[in-house]
Structures are given as C-alpha cells and as structure tokens.
Amino acid sequence: MSAFRMSQPPNVVAIDLGAESCRVSLLQWNGDVPQIDLVHRSSNGPVARGHSLRWNLQGLLNDVSIGLRLCAERTSDPIASIGVDGWAVDYVRLNKDGVPIGDPYCYRDERTLASGAAIEEACPAAFLYRETGVQPLRINTLYQLVADRHAGVPQRCRWANLPEYVLSQLGGRIVAELTNAAHTGLLDARANAWNKAVFGCAGLDFDAAPELVSTGSDIGVVNPDLRRLARFAATRLIAPACHDTASAVAGIPAEGDAWAYISSGTWSLPGALLDHPVLSDEARNAGFTNLRAAGGQYCFHKNVNGMWLLKQVQKQLCVHESACNLRELIAAAERSACPHGVVNVDEPRLLLPGKLASLMNQQLLEQGLPVIPEEESSLPAFARLIFQSLAQRYEEVLGDLVGLTGRKLERIYVVGGGSLNAFLNQLTAEATGLPLSCGVVESSTIGNFAVQLASLEGAPDARDRIRHWAKVLNSSAEC
C-alpha cells in the first residue's frame, strides 16, 4: 500500500485539450474529500493558413503554461503529477532536433481527400478493419500521414499526437499512449503494438512512429522551468487515457459491465466497454469501431450525430439572441407537440454545415409527413424533432451493439455536455427502456485524474483502481 493511500491523496493537475476550448483543472483534498477547480479555460479552434487549416500550437502551449502557473498559486501543497488528454488524430511532425516543422494540420483540412482515395486503393477497408478494428475515416492519422508523404514531408520525420506532444513539452519523453494510438488507424487490434502491415500498405516509415506506452505510464519529470515553481519541484508526468473520450469513459462510476455509455456533445458516441475487440464484417458494416480504453479494455461504439444538428438549425433560424438560449429552448421543446415522425440523423447531408432545417423538412416530406415552418418561432418544434430522432437512433445503435456482442444492458451512463439535457435523457430512457444516469459534464477531467491517482499508487492500468477513483471523484463533482 502506498503512502498516500494511508493518509491524504495527492494533488494532481489534469489538462484537457478540446477542439473548441482547453481546460486546466486542479484536484486538491480536504482530508479524503476531493475538491476539483477549473483553474484556467481558454478558447481554441483551427486557423486558416493560406489554403490549409492548422492549429495554433504555440498559443495552445502558452495557455497550458498559464494554467499550470495558476495551479501553483492555488495550492500550498506539492503537485504530484500532471496528465494531458485531448482530441485524437491530429499530430505534430518533428525534425531531427525534435522541433516542429510547422503548426499541425486540423483533421478537417481537405488534404486527406486525395490521400483517402490512395489509401482506399492500396489498403481495402475490410483489411484495415480486420487489422486495426477502427473504421477507416479520412480524418484518422493514417490518412493525414499519407497526405504528408504526398506533400513531400520527409518520411523519417517523427510525429507525436497532440496530448502526448504537450506532455513532452512539459518534460516527458515522446510517446504514444494506447487509447490515443488506436485513433491513428495504425495500432494492431489484438496487440499493444503498431501494425506493420498497415504501415507497409500505406507506404509509411515505421521508424517515425513514437514509442507506445500503456495507459497511466509515468513518462518523466517536469522540465526545469516548471521545477522552479515550488509546487512542481518533484512533479511527475503521466500519460492518462490521452484520448478524451477514453478519459470520459474512465470517469464513469459504474459497477459491473451490464451498462452502456453515451458520450454526448456535438457528436454522440453510444457504446460499451468490452474485454476483446469485435472485428467481424457485421461490426464493420454496422459502423462500429474498436478503440482502446483505460484498464486494458476496448471502447466499442459508433459515431452518431449529436447537438451539431440543433446548433446548425439555430444558426439558420435564429434572429433574436434570446431565441438561441439553449436551456430555454430545451424547456420549450419539452412543451412542444410530439412530432409525427423522426428523421435519420446520420443522413450524410446532415453531417455538413448548411440549412439543416430545410434538409430535415425534406426528409419529412419524403416520408409523407407534415413539415415544420422554417421560422424562429418553430425552433422548439425542430429541437423536439432532433431530440426524438436522436433518442431513437441511440436505441437502434445500442440494439445493434447487443446483437453484435451478446452484452446484456441494464443502464446507460451519459457523459459530456449532453448530460445536462434532461429532456433528451428522458427521451433516451423511454426509447431504450433503460434507466439513465447523468455523469459529470467534464467526465474526461475526472477520468484523467482517476488514471493519474491509480498510477501514483502503483496500479497505472488497474481497472478496479481507476473505477474506485472515478467513484470517489464523482461523489463531489458537479453535473
């Protein structure tokens, strides 16, 4: 038993990199009672550079530095460790001296259109799924690295996913943590190793890939600049579940395995934790993906549209700012009449920016159903249609999951911003027939902390210890 488990647990810092905002949070303790403070939040987003879409890497690092210095001012006790999680697939390319060769591309950059066609010809989708368990998507790191090759970037240039790169800039060695490595489309589905066959068919340099490490690995001590701050004098750097969805799932305080999760936000990810990947043609054709999870498991889920739909309808129809208040709109939607039918939220046209209210009405027309007037006063009706359609889609996806895995489901946990949408949660419970529990909004921060605490007590990837700390932290966190 470690010393901190016999007395007060340690203070730790979680950095959560988001495509829209980045957060630095501090975990402190009052005896055995945790106190979590969001110390610094900064906006983030891709920046147009000529014909490309990039991330402002230095700006991101500056905001992380500000957050860490504020953490040092907020506590009188040492900070034991720092962990970083964030969005997947994007990365930094490095020269021989370890210096970035430029700001990293955003996954929405159109350069993967050409590389996607090249990969589809060289590496069939069925082969990629069988080898990696991941749905072939053009945003994946695999496609971006091939785009680099087509653009003449030297293949020997090493690369590091963004959360792990930030950890390296804080003093750690350059690594790829398993949950984030899975999103590259280059990790072997069955082993904790890069898949050489996929590197080969894509024409990528295997030696440019970073060292793989398991979830919760200690990758070094903070750099001298941070060590000058007394609170960081002996701080370790830990690779948590570096993919933010994996961290969010790690933050769920669940018992047993008869449960599903929905990571709900701009996108929705309905799925379940499994001990082994599902690599069948049926799973691939149903659109499920196998990603790594903390505790040596797999996140088996499907990408489904989410609150993106409502944001786009608001963008189309909102005239007065008051009509755009999300909380009031959800309440008005609950008072609206039940729609005559639902729309297919994953219809390809609804995945792109545009006049989504018009596109949803087109779907209603195709079903012979009444359309909704495309005016601001109809926003509650559109919101109700979206929520009803999402709830039905969740029921369909979870039904497919049960059929593919044989998993019995007794409860659903909702994490992310969508957990605050009580009406959508109610509709989801009604559609699935399952009780639903609301997780905390920043579940990725909870999961980040939980993995760090398990690592500090010598059980970095122990499922039971991660789950224990998730329960402790959820007990005092705000939904």
Q: What residue spans do the PLM features occupy?
A:
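N-terminal glycine/serine-rich phosphate-binding loop of ATP-dependent small-molecule kinases
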Residues: 1-102, 130, 227-237, 432-434
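Active-site core segments that coordinate phosphate-bearing ligands/cofactors
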Residues: 2-7, 13-14, 26, 113, ...
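Short, basic and Ser/Thr-rich N-terminal targeting/leader segments
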Residues: 8, 18-20, 78, 85-87, ...
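Short beta-strand-loop/turn "lid" adjacent to the catalytic site in phosphate-handling enzymes
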Residues: 49, 69, 73-106, 132-139, ...
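Short glycine/proline- and acidic residue-enriched helix-loop micro-motifs
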Residues: 50-54, 125-135, 208
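Short, well-ordered amphipathic alpha-helical segments that serve as non-catalytic structural scaffolds
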Residues: 59-72, 191-197, 393-400
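Short glycine-rich phosphate-binding loop at a beta-alpha junction
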Residues: 77-86, 157-158, 211, 404-416
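Carbohydrate-associated surface elements
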Residues: 109
